[in-house]
């Protein structure tokens, strides 16, 4: 009996180790290229509107793929989908590295990488729920969460070092390391019974077309892209109202508090993601820092602070003071952006402090948004609603990166708005930081109103 229990426990621990490796490299793949965006822009002589698609392409297929893999896990089985995701991710890495001299191939490779990497967060949680004993699941989820946070933290530092001392193209090879998990996971995971079900491919295609063309509009400002996007979304909404098992539950659209919470959360998450994508350009133009310095000195401390702030935010929410946590988070965000807009020209170390408070504020805000949104859902809506929140959060990050790239490439925000004598190189970035602060405050006011009018006990 004890031997059987020990073997089972060992198997569970082995599964958890390989899941942690997949989770780490999934996040790392998302983070490492961010600090190299200015270098990529210089290599291809492209504006930020085009260059930011290196990250936007990944986030686009990553967010959509996360939802798709979750839908398919019962129909095709976890083992098969994990293997598919790992192979696709590695295939994208090879294409990107071999074809890194061609911008179109690089973007295509990032689309492919995102489609593969999306399998990891979508399926890792399902594996934990199915294979790890109930009494150990909390520890397992906590460990994976810590590994993900560590990946987000060290990603910019690793990316900056490799890009500065070797070349940014080698960052594309990092996900290939995940191939080592294949034989172990295939051996450890059981053969599953496939459940027949309907998969709404038409709905996914319509939604994806709408999203892609909207992002193209945000970087090119072509009205034709916007028209295609709007038409695709209208057809998508009509489609999900007719089918029996839609990709997105149309009933959630009638839950106004939920939709407002998701929208405001998405705007805040997208704003911060856009800011983080802007930091490498800003530090190069204003302070002439190297890629290694931007990754390890400027961004790294902020990404690591997320672990601490996220833990504190969770404690505040558990003690039933989410409004207090929300106010702290929004204060950190808005004041940090506002302060940075006025003091951008000061020492580069100042931006390190700003990023610590920005990402710390985001940790507080994420925790509270999740609480508020979940509290606006009925019990039968919880699964679909929280999945939609997760999908929207990921998608908004890619959208924020695309929008900021577009704003960095047009002269709209070039004139000086602040009444200060500063170097002309700071005008654009100061204006954007001022805009970020305003967006955060408006989103906060709407969320605050939603919170106060909620009839549920948080």
From Swiss-Prot:
The chain crosses the membrane at residues 12-33, 81-100, 111-129, 140-162, 165-185, 201-221, 223-240, 256-276, 297-317, 324-344, 346-365, 432-451. It is a multi-pass membrane protein. GO terms for biological process: proton transmembrane transport; response to antibiotic. Signal peptide: none annotated. The keyword Disulfide bond does not apply. Keywords: Antibiotic resistance, Antiport, Cell membrane, Hydrogen ion transport, Ion transport, Membrane, Plasmid, Transmembrane, Transmembrane helix, Transport. One of its GO terms (cellular component) is plasma membrane. This is Tetracycline resistance protein. It comes from Staphylococcus hyicus.
């Amino acid at each position: 009996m004890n031997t059987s229990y020990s073997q089972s426990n060992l198997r569970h621990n082995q599964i958890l180790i390989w899941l942690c490796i997949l989770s780490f490299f999934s996040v790392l793949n998302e983070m490492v290229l961010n600090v190299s965006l200015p270098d990529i822009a210089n290599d291809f002589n492209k504006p930020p509107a085009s260059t930011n698609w290196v990250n936007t392409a990944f986030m686009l297929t990553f967010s959509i793929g996360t939802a798709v893999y979750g839908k398919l896990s019962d129909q095709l089985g976890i083992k098969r989908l994990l293997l598919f995701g790992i192979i696709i991710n590695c295939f994208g890495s090879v294409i990107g590295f071999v074809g890194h001299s061609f911008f179109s191939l690089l973007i295509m490779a990032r689309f492919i990488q995102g489609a593969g990497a999306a399998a990891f967060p979508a399926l890792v949680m399902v594996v934990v729920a199915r294979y790890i004993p109930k009494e150990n699941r909390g520890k397992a989820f906590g460990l994976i969460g810590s590994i993900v946070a560590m990946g987000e933290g060290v990603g910019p530092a690793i990316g900056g070092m490799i890009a500065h001392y070797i070349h940014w193209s080698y960052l594309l090879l990092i996900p290939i390391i995940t191939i080592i998990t294949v034989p172990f996971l295939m051996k450890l995971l059981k053969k599953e019974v496939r459940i027949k079900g309907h998969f709404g491919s038409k709905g996914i295609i319509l939604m994806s077309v709408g999203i892609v063309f909207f992002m193209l509009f945000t970087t090119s400002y072509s009205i034709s892209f916007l028209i295609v996007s709007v038409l695709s979304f209208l057809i998508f909404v009509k489609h999900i109202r007719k089918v029996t098992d839609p990709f997105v539950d149309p009933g959630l659209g009638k839950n106004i508090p939920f939709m407002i919470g998701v929208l405001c959360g998405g705007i805040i998450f997208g704003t911060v993601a856009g800011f983080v994508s802007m930091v490498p350009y800003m530090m190069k133009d204003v302070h002439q820092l190297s890629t290694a310095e931007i990754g390890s000195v400027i961004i790294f401390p902020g990404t690591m602070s997320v672990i601490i702030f996220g833990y504190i935010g969770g404690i505040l929410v558990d003690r039933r003071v989410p409004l207090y946590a929300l106010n702290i988070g929004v204060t950190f965000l808005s004041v940090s952006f506002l302060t940075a807009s006025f003091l951008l020209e000061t020492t580069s170390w100042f931006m390190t402090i700003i990023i610590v408070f920005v990402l710390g504020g985001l940790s507080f805000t994420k925790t509270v948004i999740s609480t508020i949104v979940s509290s606006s859902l009925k019990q039968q809506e919880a699964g679909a609603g929280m999945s939609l929140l997760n999908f929207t959060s990921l998608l908004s990050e890619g959208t924020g990166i695309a929008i900021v790239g577009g704003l960095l490439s047009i002269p709209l925000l070039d004139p000086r708005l602040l009444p200060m004598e500063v170097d002309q190189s700071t005008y654009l970035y100061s204006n954007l930081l001022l805009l970020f602060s305003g967006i955060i405050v408006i989103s906060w006011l709407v969320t605050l109103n939603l919170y106060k009018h909620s009839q549920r006990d948080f």
